């Protein structure tokens, strides 16, 4: 589109001699093929005029200027057929350049102005409003590759409310700023995913809700198209997570609940429990300590509702290494553990007396 607009504008502003007759306020450069006295007439007369560079104008002349209907043809093959006023393209008309760009619609002082249709050689097409040679107001832009936009334009750019569709089935409905999806909007994806919320420069950024095709729902903060910051995620199974996210995954401090009744509150890394946290089981057990890759690993304390308690080392979710096990009556074992069982040498404390003891996979042998 700029090719045509620039050509016409340059002609009007600089008054190039080669195309002076197209836009100049003065038609002195026109050479009539059919001699006459049109320049002195106060009513339009249809004449054929030829410029020295080979451009021709056939149409009405009034007071020495193109006025009314006329056809102007440039030496390179560009052509305008339509209305003129005071030597400029004004009113209804069609311009086609040698490369195949075509504009048909309203003009004002040599520029697209009003309603019109612009077609590219590639097959792309725009129909809608123009102001001073640029897309403005409401219009429809259809690309040759199957994309389309229907909505508001400002200063030649998508700006305001509109609907943008892709050939693969994606669809956006919402606000645009400076040609980009920015503001509030709704995005539909071919696989059934839906996002509704804020956009910045074409990406999901700000507050929003994403419903994935598998039923997972995230509501919270987005940045650069991903869940980032504070949010809440819910799975079809009934699992929920609320807390910090990074790169679309639970990451940082958060709380997760399972349908079984288990609950975890603490640190996450890349979607799994990792770091310091507390896991409360539905049966009343409570673990408070370190986690690694989703399992109890490191130092921690496991308490039972019956009053039993273990404090010590864990490996891959099991009591492993050195630890202290306390019974409800106050009896205590301090020593080694293996796969959740008392194992190895230790000290058994009962009734206030400490006695060396030894266990083999939970069975006392000394």
Q: Residue spans of the language-model regions?
A:
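Bacterial N-terminal signal peptides that target proteins for export
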Residues: 2-10
């Amino acid at each position: 589109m700029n090719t045509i607009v620039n050509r016409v504008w340059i002609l009007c502003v600089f008054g190039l001699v080669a195309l002076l007759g197209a836009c100049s306020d003065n038609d002195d450069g026109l050479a009539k093929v059919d001699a006459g006295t049109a320049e002195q007439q106060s009513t339009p007369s249809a004449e054929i005029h030829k410029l020295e560079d080979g451009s021709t104008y056939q149409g009405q002349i009034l007071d020495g200027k193109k006025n009314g209907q006329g056809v102007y043809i440039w030496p390179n093959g560009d052509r305008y057929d339509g209305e003129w006023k005071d030597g400029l393209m004004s009113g209804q008309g069609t311009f086609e350049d040698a490369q195949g760009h075509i504009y048909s619609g309203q003009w004002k002082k040599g520029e697209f102005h009003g309603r019109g249709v612009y077609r590219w050689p590639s097959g792309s097409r725009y129909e809608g409003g123009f102001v001073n040679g640029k897309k403005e107001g409401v219009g429809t832009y259809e690309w040759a590759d199957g994309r389309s936009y229907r909505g508001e334009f400002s200063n030649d750019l998508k700006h305001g409310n509109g609907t943008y569709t892709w050939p693969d089935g994606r669809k956006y409905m919402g606000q645009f700023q400076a040609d980009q999806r920015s503001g509030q909007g709704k995005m539909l994806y071919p696989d059934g995913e839906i996002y509704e919320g804020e956009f910045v420069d074409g990406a999901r950024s700000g507050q929003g809700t994403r419903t994935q095709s598998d039923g997972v729902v995230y509501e919270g903060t987005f940045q650069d198209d991903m869940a980032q910051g504070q949010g809440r995620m819910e799975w079809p199974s009934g699992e929920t997570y609320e807390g910090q996210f990074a790169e679309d995954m639970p990451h940082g401090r958060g709380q997760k609940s399972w349908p079984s009744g288990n609950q975890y509150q603490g640190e996450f890394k890349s979607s799994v429990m990792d770091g310091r946290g507390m896991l409360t089981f539905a049966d009343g057990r409570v673990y408070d300590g370190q986690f690694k890759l989703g399992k109890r690993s490191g130092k921690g304390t496991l308490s039972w509702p019956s009053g039993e308690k273990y404090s010590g080392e864990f490996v891959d979710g099991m009591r492993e290494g050195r630890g202290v096990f306390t019974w409800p009556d106050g009896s205590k074992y301090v020593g080694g553990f293996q796969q959740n069982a008392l194992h190895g040498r230790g000290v058994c404390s009962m009734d206030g007396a400490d006695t060396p003891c030894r266990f083999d996979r939970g069975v006392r042998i000394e």
